Swiss-Prot record:
GO CC terms: glutamyl-tRNA(Gln) amidotransferase complex
InterPro entries documented for this protein: Amidase (IPR000120), Amidase_CS (IPR020556), Amidase_dom (IPR023631), AS_sf (IPR036928), GatA (IPR004412)
Source species of the chain: Rhodospirillum centenum (strain ATCC 51521 / SW)
Keywords (A to Z) from UniProt: ATP-binding, Ligase, Nucleotide-binding, Protein biosynthesis
Name of protein: Glutamyl-tRNA(Gln) amidotransferase subunit A
Family membership: Belongs to the amidase family. GatA subfamily.
Enzyme superclass (EC): ligase
Residues annotated as the enzyme's active site: K78 (charge relay system), S189 (charge relay system), S213 (acyl-ester intermediate)
Length: 521
């Protein structure tokens, strides 16, 4: 029998309903996986007690015939979602010790539907990054990194005669550590979520996507990442980065699992003024395999200079897969695409600088004392925020300042409107758009740390959908010559995640089963 932590969500639900195993057994298998992969630095907070309590409740519901849509499925939660009574850090020193007195709407929806929380996973600090290297708790290591487990004796060496005598009778205390040939990034900012799902530590994970933070890491580790339409999932209780861009979504191993999880995550929330009051369909029913006549837009502007030939070939292969299934490729133009990244890196830091003004050391989190209130603010923010967060606060404050507001922020918002118009016109010609997810495969930890512009370019294909508020999905499509995963991205009409899911399932079927990463539980 397949290891329980290697089952998909759909397979696990079938097994639970058939009584082949219990939710407690499924959860215990995943808790062992959490322990076995600690060397990847995936989790900030593990919640084994909560998980086992939730699993026991799920077993009782299965026994009573009242099982819920996600009953007993162990998942990981990106540590940007507030969880009542459980440490929530946003991977930042400034939120030290913060345990929210409330639950985010998205996680509340998941617990309502029976999901089991394994813990809170690592991310780039305040979701600002594309590699999961800006976390106060250290970088997440991709399960696609090359390394090996080694056993070492954990006992400290003493000195003196008594220590030598004790050493002679001591039992060895082996601990497992990792030796790495090359540590790769898992992408970001939802790198912990991506690594947890790819390494078979969690069946699925929540992510957030502001400029590609679900889709790009999904591409880097070979899983499915779905950013819904802005407003589809509530933002209430999610630590804010850029409020007009942030959107929660599922990260899973299959398209069907993403459909199952999105149905539980989504829904109107009166506590979020940007939440859309639109029906949530049964996304699993969209997976029909029938895309005959579907018009697939191929934007000519996405053929960027310097894009590796193998990514271009994979893109063309994706077109052929859809064409073979009866879809109709259509070349389209999104003329303002080249302005998307610079506009994003004005709008997002501007909103971040405003959102992060609330962290002052007064009511919660870190406080570094000073001789007066002003110095306490300065000390707390200076010590509490990491380098990348400070950089984006400075950029945001600059572009919002009186002398530069019109030249930068106002102009960026006008460009954003043009980008949205480009997509609106494109929908007259096509039903869905196909592009690469990222311009490269995963790179080594530390390789781009000193070049923020090179790091920002990781989001070149994903940012436009955020600026336009559109749904986007990354589906694994194969391996590059270097043996690392590559993804293809689908972008859809507002609130038409169903068509994305239907189309992605066809790509998934054509690409075939994807290999396990070298490091997995």
């Amino acid at each position: 029998m397949m290891s329980l932590n290697h089952l998909t969500m759909a397979e696990a639900l079938a097994g639970l309903r058939a009584g082949e195993f219990t939710a407690t057994e499924l959860t215990e298998a995943h808790l062992r996986a959490v322990e076995a992969t600690r060397g990847l630095n995936i989790f900030i907070t593990e919640t084994a007690d909560i998980a086992l309590r939730q699993a026991k409740a799920a077993d009782e519901r299965y026994a009573a015939g009242t099982a819920l849509p996600m009953d007993g499925l162990p998942i990981a939660v990106k540590d940007l979602f507030c969880t009542e009574g459980v440490l929530t850090t946003a991977a930042s020193h400034i939120l030290d010790g913060f345990k929210p007195p409330y639950e985010s709407s998205v996680t509340a929806n998941l617990w309502r539907d029976g999901a089991v929380m394994l813990g809170k996973v690592n991310l780039d600090e305040f979701a600002m990054g594309s590699a999961n290297i800006t976390s106060y708790y250290g970088p997440v290591i991709s399960p696609w990194s090359k390394g090996r487990r080694v056993q070492r004796d954990a006992a400290p060496a003493g000195s003196g005669v008594l220590s030598e005598v004790a050493e002679a009778f001591r039992q060895p205390q082996p601990v497992t550590e990792w030796e790495w040939e090359r540590r790769l990034v898992p992408g970001g900012s939802s790198g912990g979520s991506a690594a947890a799902v790819a390494a078979r530590v969690a069946m699925a994970a929540t992510g957030t996507d502001t400029g590609g933070s679900i889709r790009q890491p999904a591409s880097f580790v070979g899983i499915v990442g779905l950013k819904p339409t802005y407003g589809r999932c509530s933002r209430w209780g999610i630590v804010a980065f850029a409020s007009s861009l942030d959107q929660a979504g599922p990260m899973t191993r299959t398209v069907r699992d993403a459909a199952i999880m999105l149905r539980s995550m989504a829904g109107f929330d009166p506590k979020d003024s940007t939440s859309a009051d639109v029906p949530v369909p049964d996304y699993e029913k969209a997976i029909t395999g029938d895309i005959r006549g579907l018009r697939v837009g191929i934007p000519r502007e996405y053929r960027v200079d310097g894009m590796p030939a193998e990514i271009d070939r994979l893109w063309q292969q994706g077109v052929e897969w859809l064409k073979a299934a009866g879809a109709v490729p259509v070349e389209i133009s999104l003329p303002h695409t080249k302005y998307a990244l610079p506009a994003y890196y004005i709008v997002a830091p501007a909103e971040a600088s405003s959102n992060l003004a609330r962290y002052d050391g007064v009511r919660f989190g870190l406080r570094v004392e000073g001789k007066d209130l002003k110095e306490m603010y300065e000390n707390t923010r200076g010590e509490g925020f990491g380098r990348e967060v400070r950089r984006r606060i400075l950029i945001g404050t600059y572009v919002l300042s009186a002398g530069y507001y019109d030249a930068y922020y106002l102009k960026a918002q006008k460009v954003r409107a043009r980008i949205a118009e480009d997509f609106t016109k494109a929908w007259e010609q096509c039903d869905v758009i196909l592009t690469p997810t990222a311009p490269n495969t995963a790179f080594g930890i530390g390789e781009k740390m000193d070049d923020p512009i090179a790091m920002y370019l990781n989001d070149v294909f994903t940012v436009p959908a955020n600026l336009a508020g559109l749904p986007g999905l990354s589906v694994p499509a194969g391996l590059a010559a270097n043996g690392l995963p590559l993804g293809l991205q689908l972008v859809g009409r507002p609130f038409d995640e169903a068509t994305l899911i239907r189309t992605a399932a066809v790509l998934e079927q054509a690409a075939g089963p994807q290999p396990l990463p070298p490091v997995h539980a």
